[in-house]
A protein has these predicted regions:
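Catalytic-core regions of core metabolic enzymes
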Residues: 1-710
């Protein structure tokens, strides 16, 4: 049966292409709908007015009449749709009016006739569709439908194909989800019928790569079902050439040699200070890299005390990585030598490739890399750091603080911001990697590696685009259950689908699709650079929450209000404090304080009050996370608060009780030192802000849910 439907649709699409068209007519759309069991109303194509009258009489009751022309895509704009036509006289009038309007709209349009369609009962209008996204490929969409769809833009997206549960989840992912369940006396619609329409559309576009867009708008949803009043199918002008892909084992093998090399060659190494080749050599040597370092320069015998080689092919033994520090015009010939030498990875620092319009030059090096099996990092990058190997293969400032955060950036400027942030906050990193033009190696390769790397506890990535969104999603889904993945997607205000031929295409702006697909993959999306860096720094510090109950303990009522707002803004839940727990908190706070949630201990309390309430919050198993609001007083100075909090948290950790604890410190400049101390002792703390600590806690909760741990 499945093969039969594919053959039927294949025959139709081939005929459409043979006629030089990319848009299917309504009758052709019905053939596709019938093949994939997409529910549509009864309809017929009338080639003259008498046929229209006969078809309308057969359907009984009012009908909808629509122009059928391969040259008129938006029928309503052409005056080619009349709804609620009833009776032979009105059918005749409507038929002639539609033809007349179509001629006025486009005098050269080919008119095949008028579609006579059963008028569907009133119901909730929704849209079901699919587009071919340049990053993620086939993507299915769902949202509120009708003429306001492009105004409201209440739409959600998933990778196609979707299974029934994924399709059903889309109904709860729009802002107006409750409308489908019935509001103000309106009945609930048949949600499973809508989900089936979504699933079948996703199967259709997955079976036929040449289908660029499918639009069911509107779909009329009622308690009895969901029927597409209109179906539009648009074919792509051409199908893009598939890019070369690598298997997981291939990726891990090459990435292991890149991130844990035993031997590195520097092509373009130099004795002259100020040269990139000199900076790379100095960083490798001064950083303490224990592997072999081979300078390559045809004009030198010795570079920084190391024997220099005329060509990389002269280097003895096996080489894992070749770092290029030569002008772009010389890269291709040197890469040929790297390929003949059998080197696994080429780190291409030079600029002057696709980013400057030299696409052919970049295509040339990619072809060389593929021919020899050399993976390319870059070009147009600052290099990379692999701290656990004491490897600093870059011409920028060195960094050697080891830790659990892996950071990548597509931009060199962002890479240096990462470096400065890490140094300022004393953040330990496992790696910092520049991706630049991403001619070959990209985020999914790095995700695959960092997901398996025992030294990496959190991955944060700045990206401007993804070469292969599906490969990224696959890598993210494999990684997220093990460790958080944070993404900062730049360019979120991009215009999107400018030349879309359907409602769905117009709705599928770049960022709208990225937002839903990244969420589907379990990725934590950071709204800005600072948030990405703070999430990366803080998430490995926080233990995984074991439940949703959050309690705020604060010394300042104003902070408590702001912290409560932040909890709600981040999709978290303040615990309803039961009477016995309320009574326990009240034993430690003054009569003019406030229990409940937040627990307001007031600002003039001594350290013992902070300690007692924090202990109670950690001790009670019904509380899952603590948010602390500190107010600087002479009674309890910042470092006193920091030390007692760190001590109590450490004590409970030793007892096997670990809960996320974040803190907001308001006060004079001493709170900055206190926050750094708390961070270093397992409590995520920030000065002068109530939003940031709760945002980090919210990110931890989002990861825990995506990883299936909560």
């Amino acid at each position: 049966m499945a093969e039969d439907r594919v053959l039927r649709v294949r025959k139709l699409l081939d005929a459409v292409r043979a006629s030089g068209r990319t848009a299917l007519t309504a009758p052709e759309g019905k053939v596709v709908a019938d093949a994939y069991a997409i529910a549509v109303p009864g309809e017929e194509l009338a080639t003259d007015v008498d046929e229209a009258v006969a078809y309308a009489a057969r359907f009984g009751g009012p009908v909808v009449m629509k122009i059928v022309s391969p040259d008129i895509l938006h029928k309503t704009d052409a005056g080619g749709v009349i709804v609620g036509v009833e009776g032979a006289a009105d059918v005749r009038t409507a038929f002639h009016k539609i033809i007349e309007n179509a001629r006025a709209y486009d005098a050269t349009a080919r008119i095949e006739g008028v579609q006579v369609q059963e008028l569907l009962p009133q119901g909730q209008e929704v849209i079901v569709g699919a587009v071919t996204d340049p990053t993620f490929g086939k993507v299915v969409a769902f949202g509120l439908g009708g003429v306001l769809v492009e105004v409201l833009k209440d739409v959600t997206f998933r990778l196609a194909p979707v299974d029934p549960d994924e399709a059903l989840s889309m109904l709860d992912s729009i802002r107006a989800a409750e409308i489908l369940r019935g509001v103000r006396g309106a009945p609930a619609v048949d949600r499973w019928a809508i989900a089936e329409q979504i699933r079948r559309v996703s199967e259709l576009v997955s079976d036929f790569p040449e289908i660029a867009e499918v639009d069911l708008n509107p779909v009329i949803a009622t308690p009895e079902g969901a029927v597409a009043a209109d179906i539009r199918v648009i074919l792509a002008e051409s199908v893009p050439k598939p890019r070369r892909t690598y298997g997981r084992d291939e990726i891990l093998t090459s990435m292991r040699r890149l991130m844990q090399p035993s031997s590195v060659a520097v092509i373009g190494a130099s004795n002259e200070q100020g040269k990139i080749g000199n900076s790379v050599m100095r960083n490798l040597i001064d950083g303490g890299f224990s592997g072999e370092i081979h300078p390559v320069n045809p004009k030198a015998d010795d570079i920084l005390g190391r024997k220099a080689y005329k060509s990389v092919t002269d280097v003895p033994g096996e080489v894992d990585v070749a770092v290029f520090a030569i002008p772009a015009k010389f890269v291709a010939s040197a890469l040929e030598e790297v390929g003949r030498k059998g080197i696994a990875n080429a780190v291409l620092i030079p600029s002057g490739f696709a980013e400057t319009g030299e696409h052919e030059l970049q295509d040339e090096i990619v072809a060389i890399g593929e021919r020899y099996g050399v993976r390319l990092l870059g070009p147009n990058i600052y290099g990379y750091y692999s701290t656990w190997q004491d490897l600093c293969a870059t011409f920028c400032t060195p960094y050697d603080v080891k830790g659990g955060v892996a950071l990548t950036s597509q931009s060199g400027g962002i890479g240096m911001a990462i470096l400065g942030f890490a140094r300022t906050t004393k953040t330990g990193v496992s790696a910092i990697v520049g991706l630049g033009n991403k001619s070959d190696l990209d985020e999914d390769d790095l995700l695959t590696w960092f997901g398996e790397d025992p030294n990496t506890k959190c991955i944060a990535m700045h990206l401007e685009d993804l070469k292969d969104g599906r490969a990224f999603v696959e890598a993210a889904r494999a990684t997220v259950p093990k460790k958080p993945v944070v993404v900062l997607k730049a360019g979120r205000t991009a215009a999107g689908a400018k030349a879309a031929g359907s409602h769905t295409g117009a709705l599928a702006g770049d960022d709208a699709v990225y937002e839903d697909i990244l969420k589907q993959a379990g990725v934590i999306r950071a709204p800005g650079l600072n948030e990405m860096l703070e999430y990366a720094r803080a998430l490995p510090v926080l233990p995984t929450p074991q439940g949703d109950n959050i309690v705020i303990i604060t010394g300042a009522g104003g902070s408590g209000v702001l912290l409560s707002d932040a909890v709600t803004d981040n999709g978290l839940s303040l615990m309803e404090i039961p009477p016995d727990l309320d009574a326990s908190f009240r034993t430690f706070i003054p009569p003019f304080g406030a229990a409940g949630n937040p627990v307001d201990i007031t600002g003039g309390e001594p350290p013992s009050t902070y300690e007692a309430t924090i202990r109670l919050g950690l001790e009670d198993p019904r509380i899952h996370s603590l948010v602390l609001g500190y107010w600087h007083t002479i009674v309890t100075p910042p470092m006193v608060f920091a030390e007692l909090t760190a001590r109590v948290v450490a004590e409970f950790r030793e007892r096997g009780i670990e809960k996320p604890v974040v803190a907001s410190l308001a006060g004079d400049v001493e709170v900055e030192e206190a926050c750094q101390y708390l961070f270093e002792h397992g409590v995520v703390a920030y000065p002068y802000t109530t939003e940031k600590p709760v945002a980090v806690l919210g990110a931890k909760y989002r990861w825990a849910r995506a990883a299936g741990l909560l």
